[in-house]
């Protein structure tokens, strides 16, 4: 079998790390339904698009055409492959990433022509995280130039009669060739009347806040008839997690999902993709990804990434633009280790402003957590990426207090909007009723998600870790005064702790303005200067701004690095 090789050049860059602080470890979610399946592969039938079948089909069309027609002048010996079905064997994570970063073809971590006898309600099959680079499969045009470092093998040569080097050939002739090719391989595999159907389905994932499966919007779904590799259809799920292809098919198809887009890639390890392989079925594919499944992490990472890139810009957030796809690795663990200044450290989330090479992830996330925690962690790290990408040189001069407080704001605002849009806001936060002057008033209880439990503690450990992960920018947006809560509505903090709890009556209306303040400030002195200007536009007095800022002004050593 002919062999070809592929190589992609790598870029050398430097490593720098920033990890999130875990203020609260959320409890493990309750058991949720689990779907697994393992099945043996079957041999596919003949492919009508294979070069051998197509040459016979072209000759047959010519033999049954008028002597003066164009169809009669084209012989099978004249046609050359337009596509190749290939297997890649990357040897390093740099080579593996290069295949996923390019946009000329789509790679899958399973053979595209393999028939799986799994029923639609048995779920999906995937390889799972790997320590060695996976083999990848793809169908690509013969015009794609492949450098020669990644080993690749041509598994099948294909011909599409509707494609020429100059554009589209005669569509009537192409249709005749396709029909003849199908007739040549019709060996009785489909006895009786074949009823066309439209591939469709829905994709959902378990969420701990909902206590149920919720839809995932924007996921790319691919269908591939295993015996017709040139007929690949793709679509994306809608807001209800549903998908429906635009064309009908007759034969069973292979379904697949990809968490990758033109903006990001999501992997389950440095050298294994997180894509899902579905069953070979003749009908719909309805997927429910359970919370204890290894793929629930990448699914939740996708939810957060999709919201940041596709929903939040309309509300004022700027999505990160690194000049290439953002690479996200989802670790199947509650935490992961990394090295910084010669020390082994642990984290649940990490953004690398400058990566070591084109093989390293930009963002790492520990995904064996509750969905809401993973979602917030991803939102935090993408917030770091957006902050850095907006102005890398300025960001390099910005201290940790501003960076982490901004990332806490993106964690907050993405979580708020996600669960509001899902109709689950009442489950995200608890409320408590009070009865002042015989009028019931409902107050949202401070919690992990609204970040209103934060205060500048006096203990050394809390002061060195928690203090930089503040709700400084959250307090500019929300309508909650945590000082009044702990001092009046629900007393319980000591006077010292209450004095170090923000007294916040500021409420600015736009996310864009808060981003402008954060991205335009290198330290707290610059931040309060901008805050005074912006808050004054809304009529807030100097006294109100001073009360809001009093606790934040007490933060010292605002660029403290506890890892040195």
Where do the PLM segments sit?
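C-terminal motif of bacterial Sec signal peptides marking the signal peptidase cleavage site
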Residues: 16-17
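Short, acidic Ser/Thr/Gly-rich low-complexity loop/linker segments typical of extracellular
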Residues: 225-242
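Active-site recognition of the HExxH zinc-binding catalytic motif
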Residues: 376-392, 404-408, 412
């Amino acid at each position: 079998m002919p062999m070809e090789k592929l190589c992609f050049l790598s870029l050398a860059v430097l490593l720098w790390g920033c990890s999130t602080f875990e203020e609260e470890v959320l409890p493990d979610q309750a058991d949720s339904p689990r779907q697994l399946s393992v099945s043996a592969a079957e041999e596919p039938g003949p492919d009508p698009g294979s070069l051998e079948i197509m040459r016979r089909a072209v000759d047959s069309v010519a033999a049954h055409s008028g002597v003066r027609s164009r169809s009669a002048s084209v012989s099978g010996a004249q046609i050359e492959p337009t596509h190749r079905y290939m297997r890649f064997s990357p040897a390093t994570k740099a080579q593996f990433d290069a295949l996923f970063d390019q946009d000329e073809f789509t790679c899958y971590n399973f053979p595209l022509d393999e028939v799986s006898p799994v029923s639609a309600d048995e779920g999906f099959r995937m390889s799972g995280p790997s320590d060695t680079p996976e083999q990848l499969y793809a169908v690509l045009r013969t015009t794609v130039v492949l450098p020669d470092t990644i080993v690749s093998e041509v598994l099948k040569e294909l011909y599409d009669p509707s494609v020429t080097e100059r554009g589209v050939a005669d569509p009537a002739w192409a249709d005749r060739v396709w029909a003849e090719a199908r007739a040549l391989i019709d060996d009785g595999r489909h006895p009786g009347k074949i009823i066309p159907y439209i591939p469709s389905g829905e994709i959902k994932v378990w969420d701990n806040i909902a206590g149920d499966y919720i839809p995932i919007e924007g996921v790319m779904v691919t269908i591939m008839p295993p015996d017709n590799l040139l007929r690949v259809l793709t679509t994306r799920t809608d807001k209800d997690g549903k998908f429906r292809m635009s064309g009908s098919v007759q034969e069973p198809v292979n379904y697949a999902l990809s968490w990758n887009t033109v903006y990001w890639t999501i992997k389950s390890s440095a050298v294994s993709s997180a894509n899902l392989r579905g069953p070979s079925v003749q009908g719909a594919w309805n997927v429910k990804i359970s919370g204890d499944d290894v793929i629930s992490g990448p699914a939740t990472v996708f939810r957060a990434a999709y919201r940041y890139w596709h929903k939040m810009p309309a509300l004022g957030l700027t999505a990160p633009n690194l000049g290439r796809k953002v690479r996200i690795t989802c670790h199947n663990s509650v935490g992961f280790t990394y090295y910084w200044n010669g020390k082994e450290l642990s984290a649940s989330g990490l953004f690398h402003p400058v990566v070591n090479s084109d093989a390293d992830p930009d963002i790492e996330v520990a995904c064996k957590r509750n969905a809401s925690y993973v979602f917030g962690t991803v939102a935090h790290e993408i917030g770091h990426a957006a902050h850095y990408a907006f102005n890398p040189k300025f960001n390099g001069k910005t201290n940790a207090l501003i960076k982490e407080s901004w990332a806490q704001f993106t964690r907050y605002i993405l979580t708020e909007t996600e669960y509001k849009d899902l109709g689950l806001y009442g489950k995200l936060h608890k409320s408590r009723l009070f009865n002042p002057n015989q009028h019931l008033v409902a107050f949202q209880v401070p919690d992990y998600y609204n970040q209103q439990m934060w205060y500048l503690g006096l203990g050394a450990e809390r002061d060195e870790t928690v203090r930089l992960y503040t709700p400084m920018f959250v307090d500019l947006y929300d309508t909650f005064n945590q000082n009044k809560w702990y001092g009046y509505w629900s007393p319980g903090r000591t006077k010292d702790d209450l004095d170090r709890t923000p007294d916040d009556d500021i409420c600015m209306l736009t996310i864009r303005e808060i981003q402008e303040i954060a991205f335009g400030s290198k330290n707290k002195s610059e931040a309060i200067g901008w805050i005074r200007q912006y808050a004054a536009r809304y009529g807030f007095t100097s006294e109100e701004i001073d009360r809001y800022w009093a606790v934040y002004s007490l933060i010292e050593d605002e660029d403290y690095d506890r890892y040195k």
